[in-house]
Amino acid sequence: MSSGGLLLLLGLLTLWAELTPISGHDRPTFCNLAPESGRCRAHLRRIYYNLESNKCEVFFYGGCGGNDNNFSTWDECRHTCVGK
C-alpha cells in the first residue's frame, strides 16, 4: 500500500474513533460522581455529567477542589461521558 493510502486509512480510523459513542462500560469512572462545588467561593458556571439522566447539566463550581466530573464546555462533557 502506498504512503498516501496508509495516511488515508490512518485518518479514517482516527475519525471513526473520535465519532464512536461511549458505552456505559467504557465511560470513565469519574463520570459517575456527583458534582462537587469544591471548597472555594467562586461562582463559576460549569458542566457535569448526570448519570441518571445520561445528560450533561450545569452546576456552579467554587474554583478549587471538587472532582473530575467538571467540564468547561458541553462538547467536552458529551465527548467524555455521554453514552448513546
Swiss-Prot record:
A GO CC term attached to the entry: extracellular region
Occurrences of domain BPTI/Kunitz inhibitor (ranges): 31-81
Pfam families named in the record: Kunitz_BPTI
Tissue distribution of the protein: Expressed by the venom gland.
Site keyed Reactive bond for trypsin: positions: R41, A42
Entries under SUPFAM superfamilies matching the protein: BPTI-like (SSF57362)
Disulphide-bridged cysteine pairs: C31-C81, C40-C64, C56-C77
Signal peptide segment: 1-24
Residues passing through the membrane, by range: none
Single GO biological process annotation from the record: venom-mediated suppression of fibrinolysis in another organism
Record's subcellular location: Secreted
InterPro entries: Kunitz_BPTI, Kunitz_BPTI_sf, Prtase_inh_Kunz-CS, TFPI/VKTCI-like
One of the record's GO molecular function terms: toxin activity
Alphabetical UniProt keywords: Disulfide bond, Hemostasis impairing toxin, Protease inhibitor, Secreted, Serine protease inhibitor, Signal, Toxin
Function comment: Serine protease inhibitor that inhibits plasmin (90%) (Ki=0.19 nM), trypsin (70%), FXIa/F11 (37%) (Ki=6 nM) and FXa/F10 (20%), and prolonges the activated partial thromboplastin time. This antifibrinolytic property has been confirmed by a fibrin plate assay. Shows less antifibrinolytic activity that aprotinin. In vivo, reduces the bleeding time in a murine bleeding model, and prevents the increase of fibrin(ogen) degradation products in coagulation-stimulated mice.
Family named by the database record: Belongs to the venom Kunitz-type family.
Note: Negative results: does not inhibit activated protein C (APC), in absence or presence of heparin. This is due to the absence of heparin-binding motifs. Consequently, heparin is unable to enhance the inhibition of activated protein C (APC) by this protein, as it does for DrKIn-I. Does not inhibit tissue plasminogen activator (tPA/PLAT) and urokinase-type plasminogen activator (uPA/PLAU). Does not prolong the prothrombin time.
Protein name per Swiss-Prot or TrEMBL: Kunitz-type serine protease inhibitor DrKIn-II
